[in-house]
Amino acid sequence: MFKKLLLLVVGLLVVGGIVAYPKLKQLQVVTPAYQVPGQLVKLEQGWSEAQRTQFHHTAQGTRLVPYDWFLALEQPCFLGCEPFAKQEYLGRFGFLAGDSDSKLNPDGLPVGLARQTDFSDPVSGKTYAVVGLSCAACHTGELHYKNYAVRIEGGGAMMQPTEVQKALGIALVMTEKLPWRYSKFAEKVLGPKASEADRKQLKAEFGAFIEKAKSDLTKVQSRNIYPNDAGFGRTDALTRIGNQVFGGAMNNWDNWAQGNAPVRFPQVWDSSWFTWVQYNSSIADPLVRNIGEALGVRAAAKLYGPDAKEFKNSVNMNGLKTLEDLLCGPEPYAGLRSPKWPSVFPALDAAKVAQGATLYEEHCAGCHLPSIEKLKADLGSATPKYWVSNSSGKRFLDLLDVQVVDVGTDGRAALDFVARTADSGDLGKGRISAGVALELVTKGIRDQYFMRAGFSAEQKTEWMGYREENAEAVRSKPIYKARPLNGAWAIAPYLHNGSVPSLYEMLASKEQRGTPVFWLGNKQFDPVKVGYEQKEFEGGTRFDYSLPGNSNSGHWFQDGPRGRGVVGPALTDAKRWALVEYLKSL
């Protein structure tokens, strides 16, 4: 049975005097029932079991709450409440079952939740254990088909990070305000024989943590910062990173920007060897990219005051290096590999695959490049067509950048980043573009770490993914990148903003695609159209095309002039199905 967690607002206000959640909607946590996975199928993607576990649970310096608090918290209810950290609860938000590992994950937390025992708060100067999100939370997928759960390492997760943080916030406030909950919580954190001084200290720290969270929440809501509920499988990544860096870390609420450009969680295989990454082709240096990502999911930094230019931060640089090494490997295609169509899915039609291969070369390869086999052969060529080199001697895949106006897809993700500016405050650069500001901060954190570690030039180059130290690392242009489509069958929904539910619908004309109602959050996989089940279900996310950033326009196949959303000729239904079959084979 699907469940809806509705907090009893009147009773809670009377008993607890909760002021951070004045509206009923803010006291609701609505999730689907836990989607129990079937038999776990792990595909060959170039990783050992130990490497999978490393990716799932390596800390990158982010913080949700202190670790012992997280384990002690109960779910947001009144009586008979189970632990917040229970897999069956967090799984309702889309978190996948984690790996058992005495060092990395001793308490069996889900994939993408990581324990860090030496988190260093740059504001307070304190060091303590925390639980935080890692990149695996958003970049590990799972497709349910019949009685199988097919794990996709590096694929987009069908999870809802903002809703779980909302639930966490409500659980914290309930714990503070309801005496019987707080007593149980304090005993779990401190033990039954804690001193009065320890109890007072916990009470003070807990209260201060919640007051800061309430204050921040009130400011975010008063500015209507996130009007588009991204829902399952999406987040407004660049806006959130900018808000955490330019707003939170710089201590300047006027630097916060409204987030109207949610994007789906992208696949991350091969991307370490692209010339530029992000949907808008905005970041080159992998270390800069990963520092920005960590800051966006609540790694702490202090970029204000007389010590602003010291770039004090909590980013776990060794953790980022471990994660990046897993993804990239020593050479292209030697790290995390894209998944192959699994044997538990219906077998591919060889004749359709062959027909689709010809169609792909005609209509897709011009933007998305040829097959991986051809790219690998080109990598070893003396005069490669698709790869470029720099002073390190390494080769990088030179992806095609397409103007927003030409591909015709929703432009907010690219255009908002181009238009955004930030007051650099105590960093002393005045008002600058978001791209310049993000490079200033991420390179500042990177270079401070290099200096303290005493790195040689060779070590710096390795840590930067063999990019050049003084090369442009962040840019902002009105473009989207076209990447190779190996593994594309495993990354629904489609387009950068997840507005097209299946591969079949990606190959449509404007009229054929339309604006069909579909729902996000169901992990049941449709191997025919290639996408998740689209039907309405309680607790799911209804995709609303009327919201800013949610258009499914562009990338149409229809006759007429190319450009302004048209990328290829009209395809017969037989050709569409042949292309779908070929894309399954990549």
Predicted regions and their residues:
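Periplasmic c-type cytochrome electron-transfer domains
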Residues: K4-L5, G17-L586
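Core hydrophobic alpha-helical transmembrane segments of single-pass membrane proteins
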Residues: L8-G16
